[in-house]
Amino acid sequence: MKNRIEEIRKQKGITQENFAACLGVSRQTISSLETGRYNPSIFLAYKIAKCFDMTIEEVFIFDEEDLKWESD
């Protein structure tokens, strides 16, 4: 799942450290989210959107591939 976290954070002039503090996570978690190495839980995605005063849909970009289930 793609996201706009880094883009939005920079537009708002927020450092990774300050954003991490808003969310209650480490700066390393923010870095992992921004580079796509980590997908947040729905709860964390909600907190991210809330810290930006945006909706989840404005922050996260869902592709059709994100909705496909792996076959057993």
Region roles according to the model:
Residues 14-31:
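Short alpha-helical DNA-recognition segment
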Residues 45-49, 59-60:
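Hydrophobic micro-packing sites on short alpha-helices
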Residues 10, 21, 50:
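Alpha-helical residues within the helix-turn-helix
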Residues 37-47:
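Short, basic-rich loop-to-helix N-cap that marks the start of a DNA-contacting helix
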Residues 1-11:
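A short, Lys/Arg-rich alpha-helix, primarily the initiator
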Residues 60-72:
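Short, charged recognition helix plus adjacent turn
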